[in-house]
Amino acid sequence: MTSDSVSNLKPAPIPTEEEELPNSAASLLPFDTESSSLISSSSKQSTNRVLFICLILFTAMALSAAFAFAFLFFSSVPASASASSSSSSSSSTSHSVDEVSRPLTKLKHPVVILVSSDGFRFGYQFKTHTPNINRLIQNGTEADLGLIPVFPTLTFPNHYSIVTGLYPAYHGIIDNHFVDPVTGLTFTMASHDPHWWLGEPLWETVTNHGLKASTYFWPGSEVKKGSWNCPKDYCMYYNGSVPFEERVDTVLSYFDLPNSEIPVFMTLYFEDPDHQGHKVGPDDPQITEAVAGIDKMIGRLIHGLESKGVFEDVNIIMVGDHGMVGTCDKKLIFLDDLAQWIEIPKEWVQSYSPVLAIRPPSDSQPKDIVAKISEGLKSGKVDNGQYLRVYLKEELPIRLHYSDSDRIPPIVGLIEEGFKVEQKRSKRQECGGSHGYDNAFFSMRTIFIAHGPAFARGRKVPSFENVQIYNTVTAILNITGAPNNGTASFAQSILLPSH
């Protein structure tokens, strides 16, 4: 209730004292009137006898009621107090474990393992039996309705946002593929030149503090910049053919090192179920099989940590980078259909779907181009035109945080989930899955599941954006992070207080 609504409330009027109703026994009393002398003495005696008996009965009833009330009142006070005390004690007991972070028993410093399952849409964990993921959920902390990715909901922008706490416009990886208008160079997922990768990722933050970090295939981790030189045996160059089991076992092997040599921050990356999602969409049995496979890898990690006696000492944070939605040929928008209003040559287009990115020649007027495209889309003459909306990048919804970078093209189109933009019609037919759409779509949400001494058991927290994870990890490790777009106080809301 707001303060205004409180101030508008008026006190209830003081109730007027009501007249006492006549006692029911009073009707038995003779009126003291002159007519009463007409009553015979025998009648009076009889009446007095009845009156006397009634008074005795009434008195007895009143006394019984008084004793009963007193008994109930005085006996209920201790019981209530006892119940309250018991409840308080019980509440304290049930939450005492989670009032502060649990002490380490074997490790001498906090450790975080950040696990990414690419394309793990929120809800996949319910598709099949996932005993190991469920174990983390039941004994840890989960984003109740999933983790919100940053826009665009693509692999490289989101993985780098997770480890820098920055939106893509600020960490520089604005898409999986794009052109830098200043240098004319093209970024691909194999680009390791540090000039692309802005911000300070967690592995760099950790090494800045003289601590050790290890990375296994996390996007950006192969880039040598700052204090991070991708050290041999602690930084694996991407090779998609490496079995998942080998990846897990490598991470586990670090716990065989002396305590002071164990990396305090480790990453682990799996391509599934994104790999299957693109081929068959989110609802195919192949997704169920892939999710079961990821659960098996989580089980391998858990059991390996248990065998080394460190499972309860390690903080495991399991995330995805984005969700997935089904796409089919009937959900297509063709740029060539806009020719009546404006021709958009393919040379202008840096990305078609699921984010339309157009960089027209420098001597053109982006505002005029947007106006003509919008006119065509709204005309009703362009198939599925109503499912595409184009913006000057500075006019995009502020919540997307997708304008403050020269790398972002001047014109950006937002596409309805499940739809795709192509240059021209073709006979090619395909149905599968995609992501990259507006992060407001629930289908783009992924998972956040955390287990370890820093996290409460069985706790659900509201959904949040993945830029908050950077500060969460630095708080667990008790190190100072670099400036970022996360909320400084967020870690306090999701972590248990330290001792």
Question: Where are the regions a protein language model picked out?
Answer:
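His/Asp/Glu-rich, glycine-adjacent segments
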Residues: 2-5, 11-80, 94-95, 152, ...
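Active-site-proximal N-terminal segment of extracellular/periplasmic enzymes that hydrolyze or transfer
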Residues: 30, 76-83, 91-142
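Loop/turn elements at helix/coil->beta-strand transitions in domains of secreted/extracellular proteins
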Residues: 108-113, 139-143, 170, 208-214, ...
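Structural recognition of the beta-strand scaffold that forms the well-ordered cores
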Residues: 112-116, 123, 143-146, 161-163, ...
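Metal-dependent active-site segment of extracytoplasmic phospho-/sulfohydrolases and closely related
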Residues: 114, 132, 293-335
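Short, structured active-site-proximal loop/turn typified by the sulfatase FGly-forming signature C/S-X-P-X-R
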Residues: 122-170
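Acidic/histidine-rich catalytic neighborhood
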Residues: 313, 322-367
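Active-site neighborhoods of enzymes that stabilize oxyanions during catalysis
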Residues: 347-460, 464-472
